[in-house]
Each structure stands twice: as C-alpha cells, then as structure tokens.
C-alpha cells in the first residue's frame, strides 16, 4: 500500500486534481518554496487546482514521466522526494521536489515542499566510437 507522500507524488505526475486533493486533509497547513516564490494554502483544492496544476504544472506543462521517487522518515516526520520529466514550450526539463509532511489518518495535514525549479534535462551525448 502506498503512503500519503507516494500518492501525492503520483497524483502530481498524473496531473490528477481529484486524486491529489484526496491525499490532503481539510485545513492542511501547506507551504512551499519554488524559485522566486513562497506558496501557502489551507485547502486541498487550492493546493491541487491552483498551486500545483495551475501555476506549477499548468496546461503548457506536459509531465511525461516520473523519473524518481523515494520515501522515508526523519524523526517521526515523513519525507517524499520525486523527480518529474516535463516538456514545456518544446523543451525537456527535470523538476525535482522534496517534501516533508505529517498525516492525520491517511491524509497529509502538514506539508513543506522545496522545488528545484524547471532544470534543463541532460541531452544524451552520442558515442563517437565503439570501445572494444
């Protein structure tokens, strides 16, 4: 069974507003830092519909893959880290986010997110010779 952090990350990757909001408790204490901005919300729908799926990954951002996902615990607080492959304006990016959270039951009640921003995806370098 997936924990709340993994469900959150997978819902972000799927751009599924209903599933994303369902990971969070009513009255969530949500704060996040992205390059250039601090975000706050107390409603699961505000986090899902406005912050994550409108501003961070709006209609022009196509999430093409979940490149990494780890979960853990730090002194009783839960942790999830995930890396998304995103195409925006014809360019490929990686977006990594780290989140620490607490739960009430199976829903996130407190969450802090730190985002690396849209970072250019590495371009594979073609081999120039075959090594034997």
Regions found by a protein language model. Name each.
Residues 49-132:
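A beta-strand edge to alpha-helix "cap/lid" segment located at domain peripheries
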Residues 2-27:
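Short acidic-aromatic low-complexity motifs
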Residues 17-19, 25-73:
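A solvent-exposed, acidic/Ser-Thr-rich amphipathic alpha-helical stretch
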Residues 1-2, 83:
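A short, structure-level motif marking secondary-structure boundaries and short turns
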């Amino acid at each position: 069974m997936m924990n709340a952090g993994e469900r959150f990350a997978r819902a972000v990757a799927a751009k599924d507003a209903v599933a994303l909001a369902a990971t969070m408790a009513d009255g969530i204490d949500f704060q996040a830092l992205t390059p250039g901005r601090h975000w706050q919300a107390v409603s699961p729908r505000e986090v899902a519909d406005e912050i994550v799926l409108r501003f961070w990954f709006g209609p022009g951002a196509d999430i093409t893959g979940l490149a990494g996902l780890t979960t853990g615990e730090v002194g009783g607080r839960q942790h999830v880290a995930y890396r998304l492959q995103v195409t925006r304006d014809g360019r490929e990016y990686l977006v990594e986010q780290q989140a620490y959270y607490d739960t009430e039951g199976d829903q996130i009640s407190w969450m802090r997110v730190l985002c690396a921003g849209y970072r250019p995806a590495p371009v594979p370098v073609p081999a120039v010779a075959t090594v034997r």
